[in-house]
Regions:
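Catalytic cores of alpha/beta
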Residues: 12-21, 87-99, 151-166, 194-197, ...
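Hydrophobic faces of well-ordered beta-strands that scaffold small-molecule active sites
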Residues: 2-6, 25-30, 79-83, 103-105, ...
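Helix C-cap/helix->beta junction micro-motif
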Residues: 75, 139-140, 167-168, 195
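Active-site-adjacent beta->alpha loops and helix N-cap segments on the catalytic face
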Residues: 38-43, 61-68, 88-90, 109-141, ...
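Glycine-rich phosphate-binding active-site loops on the catalytic face of alpha/beta enzymes
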Residues: 27-37, 101-114, 169-181, 217-237
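Short acidic, glycine/proline-enriched helix-loop-strand junctions
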Residues: 45-55, 142, 194-201, 239-240
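Well-ordered, non-transmembrane segments within structured domains
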Residues: 77-116, 128, 159-165
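N-terminal capping/small domains of soluble enzymes
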Residues: 1-79, 83-87
Length: 240
């Protein structure tokens, strides 16, 4: 699985379709803010100059459907949608969009406005995380991914990985960030050894060799963000 990772304010259908020729087979829309609280947070993030996909609550779901339909009409890639919301109902609602293959719960974002809501990487600190993921898994009409950030202070990454696996999610998407050390491939190996879930490794993939290193560490697939953030990839994933 070769995934374009979510990039807020960047990964819409027009951008993602430019990357298909490089060999990606999963295209991630978003992240999208999909409830009132996260939409208000998105407005504050935009005010300080960051890019966001931020639509009113009465239009965001139709916008996601439009973007997903655009991709499906142009290629055979799977469409994933990375979502931020305080409660899981909006994730389930997006899963009902026929052209969305995967809904991805965002436990990754670091923006303070979202962290203050218990969203983004602070999802991993919530006592109801298991209930949240299980609700999505039990009610979703699509496959379910959970994207986490590794090595967050106060969070046991291996415990979170096990929780996601136990909840029955289809994919665990791990930003194997390790401050000042590149991708934490040892952690990817540890997660692979202690879970059965399909593991997507992310962080610092800038070449074909980096892809192989991530796979050799135990990931079942990988995702790329920054290396393709300008809509161009300087290596060809079709070689894998």
């Amino acid at each position: 699985m070769k995934v374009v990772a979510p990039m807020a304010g960047i990964c819409d259908s027009e951008f993602l379709l430019r990357l298909v020729p490089y060999g990606f087979d999963v295209l991630t829309l978003g992240g999208y803010n999909v409830d009132e609280a996260t939409i208000l947070a998105g407005e504050e993030i935009i005010k300080r100059g960051r890019k966001e996909f931020n639509y009113p609550l009465d239009t965001v779901f139709s916008q996601i459907e439009l973007e997903a339909n655009n991709i499906k009409s142009a290629c055979d890639a799977l469409v994933s949608c990375n979502l931020r919301c305080v409660n899981p109902d909006s994730v389930v609602r997006v899963s009902m969009i026929e052209s969305v293959d995967i809904v991805e719960i965002n436990c990754h974002c670091r923006q303070e406005e979202l962290l203050s809501l218990g969203c983004g990487q602070n999802m991993m600190l919530r006592p109801d995380l298991e209930d949240y993921i299980s609700y999505v898994v039990d009610n979703s009409n699509s496959k379910v991914s959970v994207k986490i950030r590794a090595n967050v202070e106060g969070v046991d990454t291996l415990s979170i990985a096990g929780l996601v696996d136990d909840c029955g999610a289809d994919y665990l998407h791990v930003d194997a960030m390790k401050p000042n050390a590149g991708a934490d491939l040892d952690l990817i190996n540890d997660i692979s050894n202690c879970t059965d879930i399909f593991l997507i490794g992310n962080n610092n993939i800038k070449s074909i060799d980096d892809c192989y290193n991530m796979l050799d560490a135990g990931a079942d697939g990988f995702s790329i963000a920054r290396a393709c953030a300008n809509g161009i990839l300087n290596f060809d994933l079709n070689e894998l």
